[in-house]
Amino acid sequence: MTQAEKGDTENGKEKGGEKEKEQRGVKRPIVPALVPESLQEQIQSNFIIVIHPGSTTLRIGRATDTLPASIPHVIARRHKQQGQPLYKDSWLLREGLNKPESNEQRQNGLKMVDQAIWSKKMSNGTRRIPVSPEQARSYNKQMRPAILDHCSGNKWTNTSHHPECLVGEEALYVNPLDCYNIHWPIRRGQLNIHPGPGGSLTAVLADIEVIWSHAIQKYLEIPLKDLKYYRCILLIPDIYNKQHVKELVNMILMKMGFSGIVVHQESVCATYGSGLSSTCIVDVGDQKTSVCCVEDGVSHRNTRLCLAYGGSDVSRCFYWLMQRAGFPYRECQLTNKMDCLLLQHLKETFCHLDQDISGLQDHEFQIRHPDSPALLYQFRLGDEKLQAPMALFYPATFGIVGQKMTTLQHRSQGDPEDPHDEHYLLATQSKQEQSAKATADRKSASKPIGFEGDLRGQSSDLPERLHSQEVDLGSAQGDGLMAGNDSEEALTALMSRKTAISLFEGKALGPDKAILHSIDCCSSDDTKKKMYSSILVVGGGLMFHKAQEFLQHRILNKMPPSFRRIIENVDVITRPKDMDPRLIAWKGGAVLACLDTTQELWIYQREWQRFGVRMLRERAAFVW
């Protein structure tokens, strides 16, 4: 039989089979659209917008975009009445800098930095020769600016048409004399709630809605009326405020009008963006540094901690160090937006973590403020370029006094709209289980908790133990299951643990110590080994020359000897796949949009309208 005859026979069989199915009442399948599957996925992903809101920068784009649009996360709102006092959220300045102890703390931190610089030898085996600021000061004091052009080429934002609000670059370049308040709606990774003007939750959410809507219209060219055809993937911090997340989801679905949303954590998205399955994530942002361990798409709750400093603190510290060396631009002010932009630029241009770069070096920079001449300054710098980024590892150098510097994952305060929150689960626990846990609490309370040294050993699981102790004790007290003495003992134990936690959160850890603490909170040695073998640094706060080698050296020197013997290599990754580390988390959100499993995570507008925050508990890919 020839090939043609075989083909005809097979076709005949297929047609015969179809006739039999029709006779049995089986409907013929609908002919699929002649669109390749890959193109269908492309169309679907093209209608998903990924939003990664940062303290200083908003990154937003379609899931199919190669790169997101990055805009300053700031808004300028016009005064409603004439004569209204100006209000500006600070950028580089923060609370706790002008305390009586601040300067002494800065000096002590700088001594530790200098000692660390001197103790580490250069690659040729010799020690660095320290350069005192006096050596540069005499030269810098004599320098005067050269006028490059009588017009800088930059202009203030045109406000002659009296716009109600301005967003992003336009807000940054609003003339300080214009009647506009400046608001940064996110500070240190959380909503910027404060007692000043525009500091209420409602006002902050309104600012965010305006900024995001403007970005969608201008940079993605999507009319707001068409958002009902789009879905959103929102990236949130690992240590998040449930109330704030709930309000953001409500804003996106009910006010902006997206048809659906997936909420996921920055650290997990960073693993998707980098292609790593298990890693210790170190996210050094502009205002906060968060550390946690992620394993197979799960951020381990017990390993999360957030440090209340980042790249902007390095910029401010660099300015202080340059002032000691006679910084020639003497009109520089930390309250001036243009000067803040300049200091950020100088930090990114000159700072490094390379021990081999030493001695005095000549530099120059330009100032191009709006409606001012373009000026060229020349000056000399020595160790200041290395000292400033090293302040991240010795945060006392920032001079921040009386502020909470470390945040751990705490128990949720509960939500009246969520009937199955932790409080409900506690209230419905069996009394027998509660009594058993209360007995275990009393036994563990009798053991002293060490909280000295390098945060290893017994202290490593303190946050989780406190978390469970606090939960269990609260439920037992609520039901009156303990006798008087037992209750007093447990209450004393709880208070001592709360004191230990507050002491820990008052400490300013460097990223290296935070990494060690986070990994040490992992449940098993196998997991710890995996985390030491893969440390991923994302965000823009540690983008300094030789940062990878510097962090790797510090981790190797401080990790427990037991792991040092069995781990072949501590791999610190700062540019996975040669990508910009600032975009890794956003890119991971775009990858998440294309995964098949994401179909189960979508929360739709109608569902949210009917069930509210309960949908987050049901659909979130992390433990809500």
UniProtKB/Swiss-Prot annotation:
<keyword id="KW-0547">Nucleotide-binding</keyword>
<keyword id="KW-0234">DNA repair</keyword>
<dbReference type="GO" id="GO:0051301">
    <property type="term" value="P:cell division"/>
</dbReference>
<keyword id="KW-0131">Cell cycle</keyword>
<comment type="function">
    <text>Plays an important role in the functional organization of mitotic chromosomes. Exhibits low basal ATPase activity, and unable to polymerize.</text>
</comment>
<dbReference type="InterPro" id="IPR004000">
    <property type="entry name" value="Actin"/>
</dbReference>
<feature type="binding site">
    <location>
        <begin position="283"/>
        <end position="286"/>
    </location>
    <ligand>
        <name>ATP</name>
    </ligand>
</feature>
<dbReference type="Pfam" id="PF00022">
    <property type="entry name" value="Actin"/>
</dbReference>
<comment type="function">
    <text>Proposed core component of the chromatin remodeling INO80 complex which is involved in transcriptional regulation, DNA replication and probably DNA repair. Required for the recruitment of INO80 (and probably the INO80 complex) to sites of DNA damage Strongly prefer nucleosomes and H3-H4 tetramers over H2A-H2B dimers, suggesting it may act as a nucleosome recognition module within the complex.</text>
</comment>
<comment type="similarity">
    <text>Belongs to the actin family. ARP8 subfamily.</text>
</comment>
<dbReference type="GO" id="GO:0006281">
    <property type="term" value="P:DNA repair"/>
</dbReference>
<feature type="binding site">
    <location>
        <position position="56"/>
    </location>
    <ligand>
        <name>ATP</name>
    </ligand>
</feature>
<keyword id="KW-0597">Phosphoprotein</keyword>
<keyword id="KW-0804">Transcription</keyword>
<keyword id="KW-0233">DNA recombination</keyword>
<keyword id="KW-0067">ATP-binding</keyword>
<feature type="binding site">
    <location>
        <position position="55"/>
    </location>
    <ligand>
        <name>ATP</name>
    </ligand>
</feature>
<dbReference type="InterPro" id="IPR043129">
    <property type="entry name" value="ATPase_NBD"/>
</dbReference>
<keyword id="KW-0227">DNA damage</keyword>
<keyword id="KW-0007">Acetylation</keyword>
<feature type="compositionally biased region" description="Basic and acidic residues">
    <location>
        <begin position="1"/>
        <end position="25"/>
    </location>
</feature>
<protein>
    <recommendedName>
        <fullName>Actin-related protein 8</fullName>
    </recommendedName>
</protein>
<feature type="modified residue" description="N-acetylmethionine">
    <location>
        <position position="1"/>
    </location>
</feature>
<dbReference type="GO" id="GO:0005524">
    <property type="term" value="F:ATP binding"/>
</dbReference>
<keyword id="KW-0498">Mitosis</keyword>
<keyword id="KW-0132">Cell division</keyword>
<dbReference type="GO" id="GO:0006310">
    <property type="term" value="P:DNA recombination"/>
</dbReference>
<feature type="region of interest" description="Disordered">
    <location>
        <begin position="430"/>
        <end position="462"/>
    </location>
</feature>
<feature type="region of interest" description="Disordered">
    <location>
        <begin position="1"/>
        <end position="29"/>
    </location>
</feature>
<keyword id="KW-0539">Nucleus</keyword>
<dbReference type="GO" id="GO:0005634">
    <property type="term" value="C:nucleus"/>
</dbReference>
<keyword id="KW-0158">Chromosome</keyword>
<feature type="modified residue" description="Phosphoserine">
    <location>
        <position position="132"/>
    </location>
</feature>
<keyword id="KW-0805">Transcription regulation</keyword>
<dbReference type="GO" id="GO:0005694">
    <property type="term" value="C:chromosome"/>
</dbReference>
<comment type="subunit">
    <text>Component of the chromatin remodeling INO80 complex; specifically part of a complex module associated with the DBINO domain of INO80. Exists as monomers and dimers, but the dimer is most probably the biologically relevant form required for stable interactions with histones that exploits the twofold symmetry of the nucleosome core.</text>
</comment>
<feature type="modified residue" description="Phosphoserine">
    <location>
        <position position="412"/>
    </location>
</feature>
